[in-house]
Amino acid sequence: MTAARPRVLIAPVTVTPTKALGLSHLKGLLWVDVMYRATRSLGDCDVDYLYSNTTFNVTRQTAGFWEYLDRACGNIDLSAATEGDVGLLYTAFQTQSDPPPDAALLPYVRAVEQTGWTHPVSRRLLELWRGHFAWLGMHDPGLTRRQPPQLAFNEVVEQLAKHDLCLDTRKEGGPVYLDATAQGLPLRPLTSLTGHPNYLGCALRDLLPAVAQYDEIVLLHDRELTQDYILLHKLFDALGGARTHRVCLDRVPLDGAVRSSRHGVGHEHTVTGLAGELRTYATPQAVRLGMRLYFIAGLGKGENGQSYRQDLLRQSIDRAGKLLAREDSPQAPDAAAFLHQHTGSRNHVDAYRLTSALLRRHQQVPLRATATTVYL
């Protein structure tokens, strides 16, 4: 009898369609893309890429922004808005002195839950992002597709309660808490005081059932969310089932400082800005490989705090062009064997180890074969 193929879920933080894609977003998306495509190319496991805007469109970050647009910008024609235009509005939304109550978001939440509705401004952004994904050769995980979460939030609460992992104080006018105190972690609210689920509460609507459906779950997140993702890791271990791995990425510093997109980002530090600078700089293949060499192997996970440098990005693109111009050596291993070298004891490929290996000077590497499958 043939053993079942391992099932792997790659689950990054979903970028909400409320602002321009910046360099930190790009780094994470490239990292996930390489991991997903390389793991899929192993051929010995089934891999899924969880990225659902539908799940997170009910959060205050997104639904609240939509409410702000309709209330404060209703007379502005945003049908042809650029990412920069939307980014400025998002900054204004984040700095408003009197945020609306959760009740004001309910019409938007209902529309998302019942029909998968997306505000026209976010639809506009997602179409622009699809263009970025196509330019960079990234797999589209369903940016504009309706992808309802597997569980209703109340079902999440019920399942957590069965395992004594939840403290529900809604009847007393408080939030729902994720309770991992038995694992030595503090209570973490999953909702507001009025019961509106936050980002973590929404994430569990897809991730909680995945624990029983997959053999391995890879959680990718930025460092600012580390405590929440340690909590998820502990939660999944307590539930049993899938082995869980975390990949923590630092945001990309600009001149030594990490800046949040909620405070605005300069055009030159967005994917749109990079596209304007690099679209004619080199061949599309060199740009795609070079971007991955820089944002994955060059910057790494980010522990060294290296700031973004356009000159080094261009050097990586130049190097990518030279590497792609060479024929693979007959002595190089085949691409599948090369990919397997960078899994360790896990079912997924380590994007950093694989990408760094392409730059080895004294080892035979099937670069063109690997690039065609994973990087282009």
Question: Each predicted region: which residue ranges?
Answer:
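NTP-dependent nucleotidyl-transfer catalytic core
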Residues: 1-376
